[in-house]
Curated annotation (Swiss-Prot):
Organism for this UniProt entry: Escherichia coli (strain K12)
Signal peptide extent: 1-25
Statement: the UniProt record of this protein carries the keyword Cytoplasm: no
Protein family: Belongs to the bacterial solute-binding protein 5 family.
Record-linked SUPFAM superfamilies: Periplasmic binding protein-like II (SSF53850)
Protein name: Probable D,D-dipeptide-binding periplasmic protein DdpA
Highest taxon in the source lineage: Bacteria
Amino acid sequence: MKRSISFRPTLLALVLATNFPVAHAAVPKDMLVIGKAADPQTLDPAVTIDNNDWTVTYPSYQRLVQYKTDGDKGSTDVEGDLASSWKASDDQKEWTFTLKDNAKFADGTPVTAEAVKLSFERLLKIGQGPAEAFPKDLKIDAPDEHTVKFTLSQPFAPFLYTLANDGASIINPAVLKEHAADDARGFLAQNTAGSGPFMLKSWQKGQQLVLVPNPHYPGNKPNFKRVSVKIIGESASRRLQLSRGDIDIADALPVDQLNALKQENKVNVAEYPSLRVTYLYLNNSKAPLNQADLRRAISWSTDYQGMVNGILSGNGKQMRGPIPEGMWGYDATAMQYNHDETKAKAEWDKVTSKPTSLTFLYSDNDPNWEPIALATQSSLNKLGIIVKLEKLANATMRDRVGKGDYDIAIGNWSPDFADPYMFMNYWFESDKKGLPGNRSFYENSEVDKLLRNALATTDQTQRTRDYQQAQKIVIDDAAYVYLFQKNYQLAMNKEVKGFVFNPMLEQVFNINTMSK
């Protein structure tokens, strides 16, 4: 009897399978599945500057302050996260924070001022990209369990806002002590140790990462008991899995896949104004691109509007310079390169040492990068330059860029906090060359001085003048090719509610307040 009972539904299933499409079960209501193109490179907040990594790290840690939510919109203003209050001295050189008394790490131990002190000292000691947001001589003191004092040698205008970025995450001191031999870099590259609403439970490389709620988080309990970040390399596969209900969110889909989803109308495809920009690195540090005339020729050769219309299907706009529209300090009157073959040829004629070929590095990290590379190859061919395309694994490409081993490369950038510092100081300060931000290895003492001046005052009017003056110089020097700023588009299951987009936190989902 048991056999006959088990046989009939099996037989029925076989019959149905041969006559009807397979029905896919929806993801349970208490679970969220996010489809992403690639694994994180590292989960260490003191190392990662990649938004793709922040999908996991941001909800796993807390910081002293966090970005506010204004209704259903993300704000660039900040409010307390671990901090209940703070004050700055009149000269802006001392900042004192009082901690809330109910925050706990995922192992149940309380978050103390000493944890804040150790986390920042580790960040500065490691000295990777995230540390670049903070003064190198920053001093941190913990006079008691609930008080943290930061001392700066000079005013640093964006300081409060830097404390909301991922690098300012507070790490469990017990983990730092247990793995002290390498400053916990090995452990934290693959694990989380924070007090955020979620924590990493498991990571199967190339397959998925699983996040579960931190049982000791004092805030409202999340609606999701499990968040799965599935690694689905092919964009068409991410789109298909979203369409049939296997995943709830498909991240980083190219325009053609988003358009297909819009036509199907099974899921929501939302667009949000973004500060994320795409640009070309031109290696200023070595021949032949150490010649400004050649860099200008490339800038005038680039078909910006063709890329916006063709590659983005109009979902973006050409940049005018390094400070994007929507960020204070933007200069609508700044000189803007456009596709002008006559001007490109005029600059080319000035080039002393004309190259016959250049290399262009890109990866599959962004589906738009390959068509941009092909468009650049076509444009420069008209000047007589053969562009050799090198498609690499993203980690390999980043390594090459960090070493300055390239001619042209491509990247995306989005700010960690709402200040032109994130663009101007990172991209152009001579002490930030390589992966920290100055990926064109640009150096100009006049620009360095203006950028330092912009950090020495909290007077936003004066800071705007300094940044705009520096911007005019770097635009003329054609340090980079400023391509476009893109709207952020996200495809999501219609059942998912409560997502709040913050332009400071692309690819970061507020999974602790979302629901189905």
